[in-house]
Amino acid sequence: MIQFGPEIDRGLFERTLDFAEQQVARLIEKHPGYYPVYTKNGKWKHDGPAWTHWCDGFLPGLMWIFHRRKAESGAQDGFWMEKAIEYTRPLAPRQFDRDVHDLGFIFLSSYYRWYQATRDPKLNEVLIQAGKTLSLRFMEKGQYLRSFVSEDSLFIDIMMNVGIIFYAARETGDRRLRDIAIRHALTTRRYLVRGDGSTAHEGIFDLETGAFLRHSTQQGWRADSCWSRGLTWALYGFGSCYEYTRDPRFLDTAERCADYYLTHTNGDGVPPWDFQAPEDSRKLADTSAAAIAASGLLRLCRMLPDPVKGFYYWSSALHILRTLCEKYTARDDPQWEGILKGGVYHMHKNLGVNESVMWGDYFFCEALENAMRHTLSNQARKGNGGR
């Protein structure tokens, strides 16, 4: 196991999480019962496209992060757990939603955290059903989970959702579910991850034969470019696949995506929205991609057999988090309702551009949480003779 150093700025990270709690408390007071996606001019937007409502788990997920933070500090917490349950429970019907590929986004951020906090077996049943439901999107010809767009479409985003199928397989012992998740990940690896570690957003397949036809994109600059958020979905998602399977092919893929990200991102660790976008457009960063990358790197660094490379990923994640904390939070803008500025939802449709986005806020706080928990666990190991 990699022994992580103590070079974390705990004060900065704690202050940032304090601010995040304030912003979410303000959100639910001002917008009760609302599950936002992105801001417009810093205000959470109540209309506009939500497509599959794929972000609905992230707000309660933030509340569960805050509850766990309180609990691990020894503080009494009634508020955040109460609110987290209030916002998580209405998502239950989505466990049967066969129209979306986003059930991992929805349930791993919400119900899984609720289950971690309480170990109520009824919550685990919801998670298992969500995994089973998502598996029904599997296309035998082509060997992939189809996107919400059409049956011939495979998205890189689905790598963030396949984990809930792995989870259901592990909890039930259903080898068929595990096989579906593995085959989807291998297809994505083969067709959407390029040799240099960059990624395509979408693959199009022949429905008659299952043959791969071409790359496409819904969000990137072009079909042959590398949309930065898609790259970080792959970095994080393939790392999760390796956690479930210990298949070295998935670890290799996660590393290649991580290395591309770290090699091609600016010195502050925050990427352009698309790495191949024209120069004037490439100046626009996407902090949500940076937050996902930081969280993914913190998970990945613990799994590497090479402690030097593991420490490189750990240090890189901390560097990204420092940048986000110091330069991109809305702490100094009292009118701004989100946590993290500078996110991008949909560039081509001009939605949530240079704004707060709910997944960016969630993965930012998840990364801060994980960074501090790793440091605490390392200090505990040192206190027990390093064991």
Predicted feature locations:
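Glycan-recognition and catalytic cores of secretory/periplasmic carbohydrate-active enzymes
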Residues: M1-R387
